[in-house]
Amino acid sequence: MSQSRPLALLVVAALVAAAVLVAAAEAQQADGNKLEGLADALKYLQELDRYYSQVARPRFGKRAELRPDVVDDVIPEEMSADKFWRRFARRR
C-alpha cells in the first residue's frame, strides 16, 4: 500500500507533463498559422498598393487651395468678411 501511492503520483505527474507538452505543441502550430495568415495579408496589401499606384492618378490643379497665398491677405479691419472672400474667390 505504501508503494502504490508514489507510483500513482508518478503516473499523474507523467499525464500532466504529457498534457502540457501537447498543449505547447498545439500553441506553437497555431502561432505558425498566424504567421502564415499575416504573410498572406501583407502580400495582399502589397498587391493592392501596386494596383492602386498604377490606376490612381494625382489630381493636380483640380482643387483650389483655401488658404491665402500671402501673409498680407489677413482681413483688414476696415474690410468686411464678404469683400475679403470675394477678393479671395476672384484669385481662383
From Swiss-Prot:
Signal peptide: 1-27
Cystines in this chain: none
Locations listed in the record: Secreted
UniProt record, GO biological process: neuropeptide signaling pathway
Function, in words: Accelerates ovarian maturation in females.
Cellular component GO terms, alphabetical: extracellular region
Residues where Phenylalanine amide is found: F60
Name listed for the protein in its UniProt record: Neuropeptide F
Extra facts: The nonapeptide is a truncated form of the predicted neuropeptide F sequence. The predicted form, which extends from 28-60, is probably processed to a nonapeptide via cleavage at a K-X(6)-R-Y motif. Initial cleavage by a prohormone convertase presumably occurs C-terminally of Arg-50, with the remaining Tyr-51 removed by an aminopeptidase afterwards. The predicted form might be expressed in ovary or midgut.
Keywords associated with the record: Amidation, Cleavage on pair of basic residues, Neuropeptide, Secreted, Signal
Family: Belongs to the NPY family.
Propeptide: 28-51, 64-92
Tissue expr: Widely expressed in the nervous system. Expressed in corpora cardiaca, hypocerebral ganglion, frontal ganglion, protocerebrum, antennal lobe, tritocerebrum and thoracic ganglia. Not detected in corpora allata, pars intercerebralis, circumesophageal connectives, subesophageal ganglion, abdominal ganglion and abdominal perisympathetic organs.
Organism for this UniProt entry: Locusta migratoria
